[in-house]
Amino acid sequence: MNPVHTSSAIKKRVFIVGTARSGTTLVQSMLASHTSVFSPPETHFFRRTIPKRLWMRPSKWYGKSEIETIRRLLKKIGYNDLSALLPRFTFDTSKWVESLINIIDQMCIRENKNIWLEKTPLHLYYIDLITSVEPETVFVHVLRRGEDVIASLYDVSRKYPEYFSGPQSINRCIYLWKKNLRISSKYIGKNNHVHVLYEKLVSRPEEILRKTCKVIGLDFSTDMLNYTHKAQAVQLTEEKWKLSNIKPLQKSSKFKKVFTKKQQAYIRHILRNDSLSRFNN
């Protein structure tokens, strides 16, 4: 299979990023309900093959191991043959990124769509790299109250440790939320970036979706409010922790159920200066 020039065929490329358990799958399901949008299950393409640390990228070798990783990931989501679009080997991280984007382009074209939406929360760490290759890429940052994310991440990592690098400690969950919040805050007011607050989305879904669609360049569709069928399509069978996305919208919190009063007080103390108010734009 030979790579093809797809820039004219693809109208828009969108990444949904944030911290796990923030509502990224919900946002994906809603936006992917539009008839022009293609959205696969989480690809993990970038986070599984490209170093998170910037200083490691210039000397990174992309070869047999990385190609095999992408092959496995493609097989899980049903696009095995597209691994042929990868370079045989390269030291050029930008070239590797181009090939990964081209693979998603080809998925989108195959499904007769012209807008694609990829949702792997930790692709948050690759925003600048992706933008350097495709400057018009749009990023949707999903944010949720720290107490709720920390409780959910702490809980789900104990129920499904094999998918979350083992059970996460309270301090680790706090660290991840705060770190990712700092990264997202760097892009406030930037072109092609929109920040979606989970609590607002649940309370005022149409308003928030319209705002998000405007940044993407997508017409709002009422289909986005009937998203539960799409929620099943964008998740793999083993991702049982995402089942809540096929239920009606609801504000829910595990904070008081998961943590003791002492733990709750500790978490609230650590988060006392962290507010999502800066994202209210």
Model-derived regions: residue spans:
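A structural motif corresponding to the C-terminal end of an alpha-helix
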Residues: 107-110, 183-193
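Conserved phosphate-donor/acceptor-positioning beta-strand/loop module used by diverse small-molecule
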Residues: 119-120, 130-155
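ATP-binding Walker
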Residues: 22
